[in-house]
Amino acid sequence: HAGFPKGARIMLLAFDWHHDEQGRPQKEHSIFHIPDSYAASLAHQFPAQFEWVASIHPYREDAIPALHAAIKDGARAIKWLPSAMGIDPLSPRCDRYYEILAASGLPIISHAGRELAVQGGTQDYGNPLRLRRALDHGVRVVIAHCASDGDDQDMDGGINGPVVRSYDLFARMMDEPRYQGLLFGDISALTQRNRAWTLKLVLQRSEWHARLLNGSDYPLPGVMPLFAPSSFVAQG
């Protein structure tokens, strides 16, 4: 941290266990786990360099008190990876959770679209449209990587809606006036070869620029085969 530019701070993300429908942690179905206490302790130890992001599964029996505790302890956001954690953002079970987030102003940073780096769980939970429930409760939502990989069912078209690109569903919500000031896109990982096709599209949307946030997607940026600079040249 000694080499950080003055005034720069990095958010340290916790990562909760996968939980079943009864809210029980399923450690055998979890790729990794980073406790809130660990992320918070580092942020408190080095407050000039770090802030912390909590990760609390909404099905947990202690989800609401844990959420209040995280807010009191200075968490700046909540991290979800729905498919890997077993979270359905469209579930009514999340409503009280959403109410608290909306009242506190704490945002959710949620993956959307296909997930490859952290495998397991239910990929359908990554459908960007499932996050409408949080947005409609007034929760600020940051969709990681602008949902730039994979395909999902267009639920706006009903139960038989067509399967379309996840990015197109994200873009639709970004263009809805009611989500102005609530929905944001994270542009980390857009330079990876499986997502690079969206980079130019996102940059061309100048009206989105104030709502695009820069994450690191660490540690994947250090895995060089994931990047193909020649694809940027081809896109012009």
Placement of each model-derived feature along the sequence:
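A structural motif corresponding to the C-terminal end of an alpha-helix
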Residues: A2-A8, S41-F50, H137-V139, M173-L183
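Active-site gating/metal-coordination segments in enzymes
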Residues: K6-R9, A14-D124
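Active-site neighborhood of phospho(di)ester-bond hydrolases with catalytic His/Asp-centered motifs
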Residues: L13, V53-S55, K79, V142-H145, ...
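A short, flexible N-terminal coil/short beta segment enriched in small residues
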Residues: D16-P25, V142-N160
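Distinct, well-ordered alpha-helical segments
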Residues: E61-I71, P89-Y97, Q119-A134, D152-E176, ...
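Glycine-enriched alpha-helix->loop->beta-strand junction motifs that scaffold or abut catalytic
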Residues: K72-A77, A103-P107, D136-V141, Y179-L183, ...
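Active-site core of metal-dependent hydrolases
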Residues: W80-P82, H111-G121, G138-M155, L182-T191
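H/E-rich (His + Asp/Glu) clusters that bind or coordinate divalent metals
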Residues: D149-G236
